[in-house]
């Protein structure tokens, strides 16, 4: 559905900025091509996502022969909320549509009691996670997966 498109965009953006964080730690730039190769993502799609992240000033584009992208600030200063908001502001926003006009009183209760609280929880949760934590978690998980032997029958 339509939600999948948004989810894919957000997911792609999180993966891309995490990849840039992991591969630009020594100041070297990360190209769209290298991210696409490493993560199995479409270069064209990645360009759009990186444009959103650049416009939000989370990453910086460097021009020239050694051009590419770098983080605009330290990964511990970038929150998951900032990343998601840059990619799709509606994900953590209150875009709750009232479907049934005759039932607005109950819809109002849902808005106040459920959706608003859920939105606040999502916002504070994503605000509490930094890009650094995300990268560290990924590195820990992938290291654990590598250390487990695989048996093929």
Q: Can you say where each PLM-predicted feature lies in the sequence?
A:
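N-terminal helix-turn-helix DNA-binding core of bacterial DNA-binding proteins
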Residues: 8-11, 18-41
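Key DNA-contact positions within bacterial/archaeal DNA-binding proteins
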Residues: 44
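Glycine-centered, phosphate/nucleic-acid-interacting loop/turn motifs that mediate DNA/RNA or nucleotide
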Residues: 57
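Short, small-residue-biased leader/transition segments that mark boundaries at the very start
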Residues: 1-5
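Conserved segment of winged-helix/HTH DNA-binding domains
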Residues: 75-99, 120
């Amino acid at each position: 559905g339509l939600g999948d498109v948004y989810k894919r965009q957000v997911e792609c953006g999180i993966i891309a900025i995490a990849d840039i964080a992991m591969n630009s730690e020594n100041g070297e730039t990360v190209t769209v091509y290298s991210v696409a190769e490493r993560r199995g993502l479409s270069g064209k799609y990645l360009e759009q996502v990186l444009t959103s992240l650049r416009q939000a000033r989370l990453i910086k584009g460097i021009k020239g022969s050694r051009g590419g992208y770098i983080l605009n600030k330290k990964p511990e200063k970038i929150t998951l909320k900032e990343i998601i908001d840059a990619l799709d502001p509606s994900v953590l926003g209150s875009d709750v549509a009232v479907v049934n006009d005759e039932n607005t009183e109950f819809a109002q209760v849902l808005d106040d009691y459920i959706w608003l609280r859920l939105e606040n929880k999502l916002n504070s949760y994503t605000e509490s996670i930094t890009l650094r934590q995300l990268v560290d978690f990924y590195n820990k998980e992938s290291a654990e997966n590598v250390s487990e032997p695989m048996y093929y029958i």
